[in-house]
Amino acid sequence: MPAYRLAPLAQHDIEEIGFYVALDNYDSAHRLVGRFFETFALLAEFPDMGRKRDEFPGLRSFAVKPYVVFYRHREDGIEIARVLHGSRDISSLLE
């Protein structure tokens, strides 16, 4: 089974998102983080599911609304590069 790994920035993104959402609703934060990890496993299994991002060479994206998961293919699976809110200035965060 293909694997995924989290880049340090992606790990940080997930922690920040979880903390932020938990301030309002702990259960929602728990469900959201769970959805992220379910999505990572699915993307590892089917890496072409995500949208190719020509503006970010080597990256693909997949929405976990309202967030966007950015990842890249690796020989042994995928690497999750970032998990960003869709309303953020993604170009500046992925440079």
Task: Please name every model-derived segment.
Residues 1-3, 73:
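Extreme N-terminus of proteins, especially the signal/transit-peptide cleavage junction
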Residues 67-68, 72-95:
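Enriched for short, Lys/Arg-rich terminal
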